[in-house]
Amino acid sequence: VPILVNSYFQSTSQVLSVQVTLFCAGFGTLFFHLCTKFKVPAFLGSSFAFLGGFSSVAALDTGIFANMADKEKLQYACGGIVVAGLLYLILALIIRCVGVKRVMRFLPPVVTGPIIICIGLSLAPSAVSNASTNWLIAIVALAVIIIFNIWGKGMFKIIPILLGVVISYVFALVLQGLGFTNPDGSVILNFSGVSSAAVVGLPPFILPKFNLTAILIMAPIAIATMMEHIGDISAISATVGQNFIEDPGLHRTLIGDGIATSISAMIGGPANTTYGENTGVLELSRVHDPKVVRLAACYAIVLSFIPKVAEIIASMPASIIGGVSFILYGMISAIGVRNVVENHVDFTKSRNLIIAGVILVSGLGFSDGLTFTIGSTSITLTSLAIAAIAGIVLNAILPGNDLSLIHISEPTR
């Protein structure tokens, strides 16, 4: 996310810091686990859903934003994210007051399943775009993951993603050492920032600033991310075989995610999310112990105080990220399909076909979102927000809704 966000700004230096992002991911994950009684094996990472918001804030050039430095624009974007995180608390309060069953009446598998599918498929262009920077390296990363996941033994079978990243990174180093470049002529690995970075140093934290325009750009994205959160928790539940929507409760997961997001933005980090990719990792590794996730969070915090590590991460070729994403994003969508199948959604019923169809088309069709104007301010809803709203509304108004709570069954091994 920092690599993508920084590409929206004109500055040649990091605007959104990798160090701060690592710290916020680690701290946010630990806080989330505290809120959820240490039961949910979720790692909070940077939300892709807010990329459009960052891009819009970066493009602002009127009023107070005219001739504004990139760092200051980031501060206003963070201010909007602080407000977005607080919206989670409102939904959590509603769930706490009326009960998760009444809320989940409006989010049966026919709604959450297609939303999970959209989460994965909506990220597919990002995977292809990143992989296309160097298809050879991307294919190596993809192949290594597949080989170790299918034919690996012992520990190697548990960590195919890490092996895919490390081996493809070494492969990229070898290619660069032999004089190869990316197809567009650019260097495969850029180590200019690594050599100048200190070994130990504090993350460059910054404080948010608040402006209504930036808030109205960033905060509505929470509509999508809250639905993504529910879909992610449903997917994690399906993967692990435990109903985390009931225990520790959806209100707790929302509180943990929302406050972690606001805290992250308060120190200059991106929005946190329960991370759909996390579900793919759980499925591939088959390691579901929350203690392992908390250990990973501690590693992230430690690494955030080592600038050289942050620069090495920043130097990772987009092609490696793309190759890994082919597996992870596909896993997310596949889990959405499994969620529908295991909950026996009856697609002989027209209402279910209509709901699922509208969600899928909305989630994939509105690639640029939907923009509307209130006064002089334009607000854009992302495709996932539109899909979620459409699915919830259709499920509520179409006849034949059994208003049943989502059922999480034991995952297929």
Report the location of each language-model feature.
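Core transmembrane alpha-helical segments of multi-pass membrane transporters/permeases
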Residues: 1-4, 77-79, 210-231
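Early transmembrane hairpin of solute transport permeases
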Residues: 1-138, 285, 308, 315, ...
